[in-house]
Amino acid sequence: MDRNEGELAQVATRLHMRAPAKVNLSLQVLSRRADGYHDLATHMQKVSLYDELELCLTKQSGVSLVCSDGDIPLDEKNLAVRAALAYLARSSRVGQRGVRISLEKNIPVGAGLGGGSSDAGTVLRGLNQLLDNEFSEEELIEMARPLGADVPFFASEMSAAFATGIGDILQPLESTKEFDFILVNPGIFISTKEIFERFSLTLSPKRNIFARPFRVHERASLLDYMHNDLEEIVSDLCPAIDEMKSLLEANGASAVMMSGSGSTVFGVFQRSVGQKKINQVCKVLSCKYGEKVFAVQAV
């Protein structure tokens, strides 16, 4: 380490953050908007599968990113980089400093789990902590909106939310703590844009059965409430969806569903089945899907 690097290490401020995945406990596509996006109604729940981030304020201006996944872009194509740039552009406290982001990817990419959006939202929250909470939660959510539909949820402190608009208008909900979830990912990247374009071809008026928040006193009916409008379309493109659902059902899941635009499927298990049963099911599924099986809980 040369002298300049040594001086930088002494003045840099670091923060470790965990960026959680999410599952969609319901997702209904309501209509297509004039801007090409779709209005949604979705119940999002953060779960205990995390990307790991380290944020470092540096003397050198700009944003740099290193990542454990060599397939992840390191420039402004990455939402985490764009989030950092958005924060720096708004901040009056950062001065001429820049940001270095170290990202360890554990959440599968293109999986319907919100990994990239979570990284971006977590960068906003982390930089805000490093800079002594310069912005309110509401201001962070507003900053997150141009970055992507799910980013406001991850920029918030909400563990669960009912989201409308394009997914950026949030109503906080209590976490679904009485269930365990097993996530299974087939290792197939699904383009959210492509799925919504295909869905628009089949969009027809429908009753908004699922377009409402799921309330605490209704938890007994959660399993009936689960629904994903996009699942049928993704299943046609990715037959593994139905296969994963069948395996989860055969191994005791109370309900199974695809998360977001796929390709991850999750099974819901009553907490009362116990960790031993969860571990057994994960072992069975891992024989086919390897390291893409995750036992998680609501956070």
Swiss-Prot record:
The keyword ATP-binding is assigned to this record: yes
Residues holding ATP: P108, V109, G110, A111, G112, L113, G114, G115, G116, S117, S118
Keyword entries, A-Z: ATP-binding, Isoprene biosynthesis, Kinase, Nucleotide-binding, Transferase
A single GO BP: isopentenyl diphosphate biosynthetic process, methylerythritol 4-phosphate pathway
Active site: K22, D150
Keyword Kinase included in the entry's annotation: yes
Molecular function terms from GO: 4-(cytidine 5'-diphospho)-2-C-methyl-D-erythritol kinase activity; ATP binding
Any Pfam family hit: GHMP_kinases_C
Entry's EC annotation: 2.7.1.148
Top EC class, one word: transferase
Catalytic activity: 4-CDP-2-C-methyl-D-erythritol + ATP = 4-CDP-2-C-methyl-D-erythritol 2-phosphate + ADP + H(+)
Pathway: Isoprenoid biosynthesis; isopentenyl diphosphate biosynthesis via DXP pathway; isopentenyl diphosphate from 1-deoxy-D-xylulose 5-phosphate: step 3/6
Family: Belongs to the GHMP kinase family. IspE subfamily.
Function noted in UniProt: Catalyzes the phosphorylation of the position 2 hydroxy group of 4-diphosphocytidyl-2C-methyl-D-erythritol.
Protein name: 4-diphosphocytidyl-2-C-methyl-D-erythritol kinase
Species per Swiss-Prot/TrEMBL record: Desulfotalea psychrophila (strain LSv54 / DSM 12343)
Biological classification of the source: Bacteria, Pseudomonadati, Thermodesulfobacteriota, Desulfobulbia, Desulfobulbales
